[in-house]
């Protein structure tokens, strides 16, 4: 006979997000209001000015698999507790080395402490929610939302310098990732001419690669060579149609309409 147990009133959730050259994972328990007050002077849940575990039950944990920066401070790859001190206008966001929960909290174990403004929560109001949003190559925002309140803090990383060194080393080896290097130099490496050279070499061994022609077209437009870009986008369209790629067909047609 299968034995069932009562589900937790604050079910646990773990979110994992690729970020930069690593990952961010957050594990926390999600309390619901259930008619109770929160973020007030004498509220039942998370009263103003009091240290909060930022969730329920055990410590809310955040793990970075790669070094990041929060509040201009380097945070080494590791697992930390997230504590907060809610306020009416601002919150204190705290990352702490101890992962044993709020009862074991010591201020001297704080790794970083930042102040962030309170915003209006337009998402889930009943159940406490943590999201990772606004994801860019080197930055993202971690959002905490409950009731009518939302706060967020930025997480930053540095990938450009490491990618530059990596691609320079790979291009000097026997295995040369020309297309990947071209994409890097165009998107992040701030070297359109080197990007154009690398994608041109890549196309020599794969002339039907519509995605390579598409990248080449965008690089040529950025450089200002519209004549070459027109030729490249036509090749993108032809190769995309031949390969059955409707997405790249639409992308090519959109550029053709603008050139």
Residue spans for each PLM region:
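Short, solvent-exposed mixed-charge patches
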Residues: 1, 182, 258-259
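Start-of-domain marker
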Residues: 2-59
């Amino acid at each position: 006979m299968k034995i069932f147990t009562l589900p937790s009133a604050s079910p646990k959730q773990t979110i994992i997000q690729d970020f930069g050259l690593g990952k961010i994972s957050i594990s926390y328990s999600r309390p619901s209001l259930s008619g109770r007050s929160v973020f007030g002077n004498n509220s039942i849940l998370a009263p103003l000015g009091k240290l909060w575990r930022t969730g329920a039950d055990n410590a809310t944990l955040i793990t970075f698999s790669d070094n990041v920066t929060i509040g201009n401070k380097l945070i080494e790859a590791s697992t930390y507790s997230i504590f907060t001190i809610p306020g009416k206008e601002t919150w204190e966001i705290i990352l702490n080395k101890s992962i044993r929960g709020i009862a074991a909290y010591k201020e001297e174990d704080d790794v970083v402490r930042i102040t962030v403004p309170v915003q209006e929560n337009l998402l889930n109001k009943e159940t406490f929610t943590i999201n990772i949003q606004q994801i860019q190559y080197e930055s993202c925002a971690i959002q905490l939302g409950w009731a009518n309140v939302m706060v967020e803090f930025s997480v930053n990383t540095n990938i450009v310098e490491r990618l530059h060194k990596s691609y320079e080393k790979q291009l000097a080896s026997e295995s040369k990732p020309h297309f990947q290097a071209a994409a890097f130099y165009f998107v992040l490496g701030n070297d359109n001419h080197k990007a154009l050279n690398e994608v041109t070499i890549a196309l020599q061994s794969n002339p039907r690669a519509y995605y390579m022609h598409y990248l080449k077209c965008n690089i040529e437009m950025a450089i200002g060579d519209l004549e070459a870009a027109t030729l490249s986008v036509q090749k993108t369209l032809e190769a995309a149609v031949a390969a059955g790629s409707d997405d790249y067909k639409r992308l090519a047609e959109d550029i053709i309409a603008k050139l």
